[in-house]
Amino acid sequence: MSQFGTTDIVSGSETPPYSGASYQDAQDDNTHPHSSDAGAEKFSAGSGSESHTESSRSDDEDSQAKTKMVDNITILKYILDSLSGRDKLAKIIKYALDILKLFIEKSKRNLTVLDPSVLTYYTKILKNLTVKVALRHPITVIKVLLLSLLRNFDKKIDFISQQLSTFRYILRFGGTPFRVCSFLGKFNKTRKCNFQIDQIKKIWFNEASLREFLDLYYGIFDELDLLYKLKIWTNKSFYSFVSRQESLAWQYDILLSLKDHWLNLQSLQKRQLELEVQLKVQNNALLLSPILMHQAHKDDGSQSPIRKQLLNDLNVNNDAEVLIHKQLKAIKDEKTLVYLDIARLSFDCMANTSDILNLKTPKGTYAVLSLGSGLTGLVKLWITTKRSLCSSKD
């Protein structure tokens, strides 16, 4: 079998990861800290600049204190308690062992190529190893023992890797019946609307239905793959078909998820630019406020209502500016998660593409790419878990 059986589905079929705070959350939640540079360049000429800077620094210190309250052991415990966390850790260990196995195989080849006599005396020395033989041929004995150790270690690594792969399949097992029920619900809705074209388009012709179909398609073949590993069925020709369809379904899901994350990134960048422009306008207005206030004292009686309202707005507290900083901080955090998702999906896409197209790649390419995917996924899960724990302590 190729490496089809070692893949894992992303997005829909994974256990949903912790979700990070989006920038919309910052509009309603005043507990999120704003960025560390907030207030550093603000309003040196305004009357509220010093108090705002002190408030910003105080919020940052509180945020750092809350973050330090969550130690790494607690975060690791929460990750291990989640299905997604166990899957990520198992994936990292499996492909790290696969890479280690490649180094062991290379070491064995180098050992036998440099000294072919090692293979000649391999069995003889292991059967008749005595102190006398070890003293007469110390170098050869050391090489034989090293080769024996590497061979045994190689077999153990291969066994552990296979068990971890099966463990990850078991973690994903059992979701197909629920996906089938979801599709039956859609069929019932279609039947109740008397198969009207507009309603059919609304129910079926959308991205959510496409993703549900891909999840169901992948889940069926993924669970059939596990049943084959457990020897529930043993048809090898059908298993080749199952492995192929499993990888194709995963590839479709990867591409769809990449598209969604790319559009999400563009939306976040657009919103970030809008907030930065808005913040710059407010900063410029506050820099002009001392001049306007000075002029207002001179001709207080001749002010128009609009000018009075403008001066009043400039003299109020900096809640709007603080809120913008919170939203910018939330967007920055959200973009970090999106970048990690894009990196993870890119690793998965390259690994799965090399497998589907049977590309001639250097040995270990699939394992290295899959390890990169697992590490980026774990980093994202670590960040979101830490944020979740910090927010729960507020």
Swiss-Prot record:
Residues 1-25 have a biased composition (Polar residues). Residues 1-366 are cytoplasmic. Residues 51-65 have a biased composition (Basic and acidic residues). One of its GO terms (cellular component) is peroxisome. Keywords: Membrane, Peroxisome, Peroxisome biogenesis, Phosphoprotein, Transmembrane, Transmembrane helix. It is a single-pass membrane protein. InterPro entries: PEX11. It is found in: Peroxisome membrane. Present with 2420 molecules/cell in log phase SD medium. Required for regulation of peroxisome size and maintenance. Has a role in the import of peroxisomal matrix proteins. Imports RHO1 into the peroxisome. Also promotes peroxisome division and biogenesis. This is Peroxisomal membrane protein PEX25.
